Amino acid sequence: MQFNIPTLLTLFRVALIPFFVLAFYLPFVWAPLLCALIFVFAAVTDWFDGFLARRWKQTTRFGAFLDPVADKVMVAVALVLVAEYYHSWWITLPAATMIAREIIISALREWMAEIGKRSSVAVSWIGKVKTTAQMMALFALLWRPERIVEGIGVAALYIAAVLTFWSMFQYLNAARHDLLEP
């Protein structure tokens, strides 16, 4: 297997996860900002690696597999850390909802690919809006410099949770005939 720059960026994103967790637990006043910046850097490389792979025509099967996995693991870890920090149901509930949705839709996409219908559950615009709201929420809730930023983060988290449900139902609806077929 030959590694290209987009794939190396994705691997780097995976390698950032332990440092991201470590930054979250550092006992310094600047640690939340460092943690949030690592998260944003990972989000930017998520966009950038896909852009470069398409632009340079360097898409690979390994990259196509690893990119969404790296994204989902980073987001799931961030959601767990945020839920752990706030230690309350009103943060844990949307976080758990988003993690569950990612597992359900990943399984659905894998199954649809297996039956040759992967394109019917391709990423939609609502999924992209959900991801944007999720990234904004997580950045704000990881950084949390002031109450107003936390409030914006919580609002964005709930917007992301609603969009999470909406997009999940869209994907399940698109696959319903195949799911319900005997």
Swiss-Prot record:
<keyword id="KW-0812">Transmembrane</keyword>
<dbReference type="InterPro" id="IPR000462">
    <property type="entry name" value="CDP-OH_P_trans"/>
</dbReference>
<keyword id="KW-1133">Transmembrane helix</keyword>
<dbReference type="GO" id="GO:0005886">
    <property type="term" value="C:plasma membrane"/>
</dbReference>
<keyword id="KW-1003">Cell membrane</keyword>
<dbReference type="InterPro" id="IPR004570">
    <property type="entry name" value="Phosphatidylglycerol_P_synth"/>
</dbReference>
<protein>
    <recommendedName>
        <fullName>CDP-diacylglycerol--glycerol-3-phosphate 3-phosphatidyltransferase</fullName>
        <ecNumber>2.7.8.5</ecNumber>
    </recommendedName>
</protein>
<comment type="pathway">
    <text>Phospholipid metabolism; phosphatidylglycerol biosynthesis; phosphatidylglycerol from CDP-diacylglycerol: step 1/2.</text>
</comment>
<keyword id="KW-0594">Phospholipid biosynthesis</keyword>
<feature type="topological domain" description="Cytoplasmic">
    <location>
        <begin position="82"/>
        <end position="86"/>
    </location>
</feature>
<dbReference type="InterPro" id="IPR043130">
    <property type="entry name" value="CDP-OH_PTrfase_TM_dom"/>
</dbReference>
<feature type="topological domain" description="Periplasmic">
    <location>
        <begin position="108"/>
        <end position="145"/>
    </location>
</feature>
<keyword id="KW-0997">Cell inner membrane</keyword>
<dbReference type="GO" id="GO:0006655">
    <property type="term" value="P:phosphatidylglycerol biosynthetic process"/>
</dbReference>
<keyword id="KW-0472">Membrane</keyword>
<keyword id="KW-0444">Lipid biosynthesis</keyword>
<comment type="function">
    <text>Catalyzes the conversion of cytidine diphosphate diacylglycerol (CDP-DG) and glycerol 3-phosphate into phosphatidylglycerol. Essential for the synthesis of anionic phospholipids, thereby playing a role in balancing the ratio of zwitterionic and anionic phospholipids, which is thought to be important for normal membrane function.</text>
</comment>
<dbReference type="InterPro" id="IPR023762">
    <property type="entry name" value="PGP_synthase_bac"/>
</dbReference>
<feature type="topological domain" description="Cytoplasmic">
    <location>
        <begin position="2"/>
        <end position="12"/>
    </location>
</feature>
<feature type="transmembrane region" description="Helical">
    <location>
        <begin position="61"/>
        <end position="81"/>
    </location>
</feature>
<comment type="similarity">
    <text>Belongs to the CDP-alcohol phosphatidyltransferase class-I family.</text>
</comment>
<dbReference type="InterPro" id="IPR050324">
    <property type="entry name" value="CDP-alcohol_PTase-I"/>
</dbReference>
<feature type="topological domain" description="Cytoplasmic">
    <location>
        <begin position="169"/>
        <end position="181"/>
    </location>
</feature>
<dbReference type="Pfam" id="PF01066">
    <property type="entry name" value="CDP-OH_P_transf"/>
</dbReference>
<feature type="transmembrane region" description="Helical">
    <location>
        <begin position="146"/>
        <end position="168"/>
    </location>
</feature>
<feature type="transmembrane region" description="Helical">
    <location>
        <begin position="13"/>
        <end position="37"/>
    </location>
</feature>
<feature type="transmembrane region" description="Helical">
    <location>
        <begin position="87"/>
        <end position="107"/>
    </location>
</feature>
<feature type="topological domain" description="Periplasmic">
    <location>
        <begin position="38"/>
        <end position="60"/>
    </location>
</feature>
<keyword id="KW-0808">Transferase</keyword>
<keyword id="KW-0443">Lipid metabolism</keyword>
<dbReference type="InterPro" id="IPR048254">
    <property type="entry name" value="CDP_ALCOHOL_P_TRANSF_CS"/>
</dbReference>
<keyword id="KW-1208">Phospholipid metabolism</keyword>
<dbReference type="GO" id="GO:0008444">
    <property type="term" value="F:CDP-diacylglycerol-glycerol-3-phosphate 3-phosphatidyltransferase activity"/>
</dbReference>
